[in-house]
């Protein structure tokens, strides 16, 4: 049971990240979005870049140690880009314990809770090892946003589906069973491209890719997300109900494959 729950949590974590990718792209207003860049998502405007790391720990109580490592990584990036216009954001969902984090962050709190740690029995003070002054840490903190009250898996997914319905003026069934699987497929393809330039996209290009895809899509990941009987019922209602005389070729469904005649 524990193994199964862990596997489910892992899958939900991936979906949570994919949904965040899609939301960042669809909510963007002229920015370029890079997936798996400096962080999970980089939002690049004409004047600055915000590097966002996403953490989804549905079964984990928040502790400072849970976010300390990604913050240390951000500090290392900051060390070599102090004069650049980078901002950093840690966006996370946790079961409980959020009241342990006092905001706004202070230099001493960040140094003590996030940048001081033990590794293999040795105590480290990362700010000292990186030769960063309190003024440097203060600048870093001013560029750092920590949000550990992120939306739940369900709420974020509902927001994405709502945005899909509004943007394409479609039904809930169409949003869930056509647009959402297609968006997942496109996001995954972008995020896993080995060339960083290809992992950068703007909203207009992303929308054009969706519009260009005319055929219904059965996404393997999406099929795993819901029970197969529920999925089949939705697809039948969407494409087959009240369409008794449908051309048999229109009934073909494949994993992103086109029907060629």
What are these regions (language model features)?
Residues 3, 10-73:
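Catalytic centers of nucleases
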Residues 1-8, 57-261:
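Acidic metal-coordinating catalytic centers involved in nucleic-acid phosphodiester chemistry
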């Amino acid at each position: 049971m524990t193994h199964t729950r862990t596997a489910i949590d892992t899958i939900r974590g991936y979906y949570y990240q994919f949904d965040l990718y899609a939301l960042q792209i669809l909510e963007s207003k002229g920015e370029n979005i890079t997936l798996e860049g400096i962080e999970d998502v980089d939002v690049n405007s004409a004047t600055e870049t915000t590097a966002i790391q996403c953490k989804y720990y549905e079964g984990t109580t928040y502790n400072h140690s849970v976010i300390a490592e990604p913050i240390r990584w951000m500090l290392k990036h900051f060390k070599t880009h102090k004069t650049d216009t980078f901002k950093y954001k840690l966006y996370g969902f946790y079961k409980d314990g959020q009241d342990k984090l006092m905001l706004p962050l202070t230099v001493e709190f960040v140094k003590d809770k996030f940048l001081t740690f033990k590794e293999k029995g040795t105590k480290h003070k990362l700010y000292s090892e990186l030769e960063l002054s309190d003024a440097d840490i203060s600048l870093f903190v001013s560029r750092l946003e920590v949000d550990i009250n992120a939306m739940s898996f369900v709420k974020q997914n509902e927001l994405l589906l709502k945005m899909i319905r509004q943007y394409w003026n479609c039904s809930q069934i169409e949003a869930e069973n056509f647009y959402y699987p297609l968006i997942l497929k496109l996001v995954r393809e972008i995020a896993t491209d080995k060339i960083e330039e290809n992992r950068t996209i703007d909203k207009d290009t992303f929308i054009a890719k969706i519009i260009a895809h005319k055929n219904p899509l059965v996404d393997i990941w999406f099929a795993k997300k819901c029970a197969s009987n529920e999925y089949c019922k939705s697809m039948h209602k969407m494409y087959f109900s009240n369409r008794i005389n449908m051309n048999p070729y229109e009934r073909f469904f494949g994993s992103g494959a086109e029907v060629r005649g």
